[in-house]
């Protein structure tokens, strides 16, 4: 498919995000490259940014999980810690940076519940982990969005090279998926609609602070739906 053709791109009016068309058909899923067939769908080209999430909050008055609890988890001193005052506006906590200089970075410190609330407001939904992986991997079973080459600092944000998130699209087009989706390895873990166990929700993609092995497209993480980390964000999908 021509990933750059107008027929394969669409601006969703509610939140103004560009979406990418993923055609129906089989792809190779998971570590064992199982053949899975999915119907066609649309998915956001990039993760939701701080600017876009702020627009949602301004329109609805929404208060995030971390703002309610007063705590978010951050990797600010070389280890994971619960930080008072860490939330989407201050990912590392007060005094450790805010989003004013990161308008085009992916929003983080959002729970699965927060991501779902945004998606519902936008008239979309979270992708399943199979939908997420197909959009990231294409149909040929590659290890990374760009192919099978090991990740480098020119292809994605990982292993604390940048010390925080980077603007969406920084590694485009060289790091893009076959369908033209951006930032699907590294930068942030992305919430999906998929459940694991009684209460866990699946995240995919690998975050900015994680080693290279975690940005392989088959890797998954599972968090409780109310957990908030400075590596966790999301993108949305919708049915045709």
Language-model features: locations:
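Functional-site microenvironments in short loops/helix caps that host divalent-cation chemistry
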Residues: 22, 28, 63, 68-230
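Short capping motifs at secondary-structure boundaries
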Residues: 41, 54-65, 122-123
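Short, structured beta-strand segments at or near domain termini in extracellular proteins/domains
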Residues: 230-240
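A short N-terminal beta-strand-loop micro-motif at the entrance of redox/enzyme domains
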Residues: 35-40
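Short, P/G- and charge-enriched loop/turn segments at secondary-structure junctions
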Residues: 6-10, 31-33, 220-225
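Acidic, metal-coordinating catalytic segment for phosphate/diphosphate chemistry
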Residues: 49
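GGW-centered surface loops in extracellular recognition modules
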Residues: 6-21
